[in-house]
Amino acid sequence: MLLIGVAGTELSAQERDWLQHDAVAGVVLFKRNFASRTQVAELSAAIRAAAPRPQLICVDQEGGRVQRFREGYSALAPLQSFGALYATDPEGALAQARAHAQLMASEVRASGVDLSFAPVVDLARGNRAIGDRAFSDDPQVVASFTRAYVQALHAAGMGATLKHFPGHGTVLEDTHVDHASDPRPLDVLLAEDLVPFVAGIDAGADAVMMAHVVYPQVAPEPAGYASRWIEQILRGQLGFRGVVFSDDIGMAASFSAGGVAGRVHAHLDAGCDVVLVCHPELVAESLQAVAGRTLNTAALIGLIGRGALGWDGLLADAPTTSLSASFGTLA
């Protein structure tokens, strides 16, 4: 199945046609798709109305520099701010992370959007793309935050997506623009980067997003193209039973599988349930690529339509209103 990107704040005729395709499971929204709270709710409704089957509508609303919906939404802190507090006040830091998750999820759901791809559970060890998106460089600290964040998302009615498996934080390269390779063996990864993923899976995480990083001592392909990582380690060894998302096939580190069709097939063949096609110019070719494939159409049902509050419902919710006052609102 595919999660696709659309170009603007309203659906075009071509995009409505795409949503009719059996392989399209939903839409990923970006800054380019956002103008206001009202508009994004209308866009979400239009996406659902255009498709003959339920659609999963997603966004990256992590906080800090990765927050696609801004004006009219709470200013969410980057996750690293909670990690910094943990050294002096661990319980307070975990409580703030739970509040962050609850507020983010409530506002996203109020907009008619099902899922924010969160939390980032990579280690904060110098990666250019991750940076302050990660809680900490300590695996056990990140594991504690991961458990708390997953539980808070569930309490707010949203699924949890752990990213970027099996850990993107230690390589320096940004896989949006470059290839990345992590030379460490599996036993080291299990003792370090994979610790938060294990904690999140144990806490009931609903989904995992793969990294476009190569770990050559484990598999020769980027993790999202490697059945060794997805089928043997994630599902087999770690016992994960949820949804596996690829990362975006428009990123430079994904190009090792060849053209658009090659990337789509490589992810699906490796065991990904859903391939992210975030660039609209890649959607038509991706749809051609999946023609004739058997698709796991039931995989996303548990993430779709958990019941949007609407903004009236959100504002009437006293705990969420007090959280918003604590974090502040973007004008």
UniProtKB/Swiss-Prot annotation:
Its EC number is 3.2.1.52. It is found in: Cytoplasm. It catalyses: Hydrolysis of terminal non-reducing N-acetyl-D-hexosamine residues in N-acetyl-beta-D-hexosaminides. GO terms for biological process: carbohydrate metabolic process; cell division; cell wall organization; peptidoglycan biosynthetic process; peptidoglycan turnover; regulation of cell shape. PROSITE patterns: GLYCOSYL_HYDROL_F3. It comes from the Bacteria. The keyword Hydrolase applies. Signal peptide: none annotated. Pathway: Cell wall biogenesis; peptidoglycan recycling. The record marks D174 as: Important for catalytic activity. One of its GO terms (molecular function) is beta-N-acetylglucosaminidase activity. Substrate binds at D60, R68, R133, K163, H164. The active site is at H176, D247. Belongs to the glycosyl hydrolase 3 family. NagZ subfamily. This is Beta-hexosaminidase. It comes from Xanthomonas campestris pv. campestris (strain ATCC 33913 / DSM 3586 / NCPPB 528 / LMG 568 / P 25). The gene is nagZ.
